[in-house]
From Swiss-Prot:
PANTHER family to which the protein is assigned, alphabetical: 3-ISOPROPYLMALATE DEHYDRATASE LARGE SUBUNIT 2 (PTHR43822:SF16), HOMOACONITASE, MITOCHONDRIAL-RELATED (PTHR43822)
Entry's family note: Belongs to the aconitase/IPM isomerase family. LeuC type 2 subfamily.
Main enzyme class: lyase
Entry note: cofactor: Binds 1 [4Fe-4S] cluster per subunit.
Family annotation (PROSITE patterns): ACONITASE_2 (PS01244)
Gene3D superfamilies linked: Aconitase, domain 3 (3.30.499.10)
Pfam families the record matches: Aconitase
Record keywords: 4Fe-4S, Amino-acid biosynthesis, Branched-chain amino acid biosynthesis, Iron, Iron-sulfur, Leucine biosynthesis, Lyase, Metal-binding
Superkingdom field: Bacteria
Gene name for this UniProt entry: leuC
InterPro entries: Acnase/IPM_dHydase_lsu_aba_1/3, Acoase/IPM_deHydtase_lsu_aba, Aconitase_4Fe-4S_BS, Aconitase_4Fe-4S_dom, HAcnase/IPMdehydase_lsu_prok, Homoacnase/IPMdehydase_lsu, IPM_dehydratase_rel_enz, IPMI_cat
Name of the featured protein: 3-isopropylmalate dehydratase large subunit
């Protein structure tokens, strides 16, 4: 019987052929922690009396949620990770000196490789599947186990094959594709499944689109999202390798067999898809942008950023739409780049000047606004159109606020009018 790409990755790591449903002990190529979750893992590590990491070069700590610190508590939280990193001389420790949201930063640093098994104490660790890796979020206790042993136990997930067909229309992005999938499946329709994204549409998706696609796999309950290695992946890795003096390791490339077993197959005609808006209070509450326009939804805040849509292409499209325009008087437009490198490139290319001229404010790379921490908190009854990944009750601030999830083009267009706007109408 054939295997899926996810089954093949686990087979290679387990040293034997394995299939969905089997329990395997797998080595971990990269363990990821952040300023919120790592201190819990560190406490378990130290209380257990352990002094050495199993694989120091395979452990990355990224301070990204509340950095620079927003208050004393977050400063103390970050200090725990910083002290641990210094004590163990961690090579892959990233703080204010080399900032970035972990799921944007690590691929940029050449630390995510096709064929990897990756775990992170953050639910959107599934982002890295865009590079043909198995990558999933786990709890802080599981992260400490990975720190101590260099491995972990997994149940090999069943796979749902998603076949995207056709060329996306203008302003239809990877964000719209995943919002449509979540609309179809619901927030638990892919529970502990691998979402394998395939079809001729993939050739039209940039790496930024693929990161967005895999980033939100968890919003359908998926264990991981994954896109097979191709020429676009290779081009991305070649550039990353050149920028970093090489990749962390050599890629191990896997492809699903034609006779691989899938628990479900979903086909989507992408050519007929228009931008998708997820209404409050679930990412699965998807509607077309046409419906949103007819609903005449006024917004108070527009947010472009996060690990979902804080990449260079997001600022490019936003700058193109906002060039020569002004943000509506009642609207605040907040931009949060995924990494310092993205910020520098967007500045060099003139995107930041264009956006600031239009009335935007630019923050440092941070997860702050997305989780309602800082740098974009919503007040009572405020409405935000956001390129983030969750729109639960109170997610970005007040429990009476509302969040509409959208791609960066829709968000930018909405900043001009002050209402959810179809960028195709501009």
């Amino acid at each position: 019987m054939g295997q899926t790409i996810t089954e093949k990755i686990f087979s290679e790591h387990a040293g034997k052929k394995v299939y969905a449903g089997e329990i395997v002990r797998s080595p971990i190529d990269m363990v990821i922690g952040n300023d919120i979750t790592t201190p819990i893992s560190i406490r378990a590590f130290e209380e257990g009396g352990f002094e050495k990491l199993a694989n120091p070069d395979g452990f990355a700590i990224v301070l990204d949620h509340f950095i620079p610190a927003k208050d004393i508590a977050s400063a103390n939280q970050a200090k725990i990770s910083r002290d641990f990193a210094l004590k163990h001389n961690l090579k892959n420790f990233f703080d204010e000196k080399d900032m970035g949201i972990e799921h944007a930063l690590l691929p940029e640093k050449g630390l995510v490789i096709p064929g990897d098994v990756i775990i992170g104490a953050d639910s959107h660790t599934c982002t890295h599947g865009a590079l043909g890796a198995f990558s999933t979020g786990m709890g802080s206790t599981d992260i400490s186990f990975g720190m101590i042993t260099g491995g972990n136990w997994f149940k090999v997930p069943e796979s749902i094959k998603v076949i995207f067909k056709g060329k996306p229309a203008p302003f239809v992005t990877g964000k719209d594709l995943i919002l449509e999938i979540i609309r179809i499946l619901g927030v638990d329709g892919a529970l502990y499944k691998a979402l394998e994204f395939t079809g001729d549409t993939i050739q039209y998706l940039s790496m930024d689109d693929r990161f967005s696609l895999c980033n939100m796999a968890i919003e359908a309950g998926a264990k991981n999202g994954i896109v097979a290695y191709d020429e676009i992946t290779k081009e991305f890795l070649d550039k990353v390798g050149e920028a970093n003096g090489g990749l962390r390791a050599e890629p191990k490339i896997h492809y699903s067999d034609e006779d691989a077993n899938y628990c479900q197959v979903i086909e989507i005609d992408v050519a007929k898809l228009e931008p998708v808006i997820a209404y409050p209070y679930l990412p699965s509450n998807g509607h077309s942008v046409s419906q949103a326009v007819s609903d005449n939804i006024k917004v108070d805040q527009v947010f472009i950023g996060s690990c979902t849509n804080g990449r260079l292409s997001d600022f490019k499209i936003a700058a193109e739409i906002l060039a020569g325009q002004k943000v509506a008087r009642h609207v605040r437009l907040i931009l949060t780049p995924g990494t310092q490198k993205i910020l520098r490139e967007a500045t060099k290319l003139g995107y930041i000047d264009t956006l600031v001229d239009a009335g935007a404010v630019v923050s440092n790379p941070t997860c702050g606004a997305c989780l309602g921490g800082y740098m974009g908190i919503l007040g009572d009854n405020e409405v935000c159109i956001s390129t983030t990944n969750r729109n639960f009750v109170g997610r970005m601030g007040s429990r009476s606020s509302k969040i509409y999830l959208a791609n960066s083009a829709v968000a930018a267009a909405s900043a001009i009018s002050g209402y959810i706007t179809d960028p195709r109408s501009l």
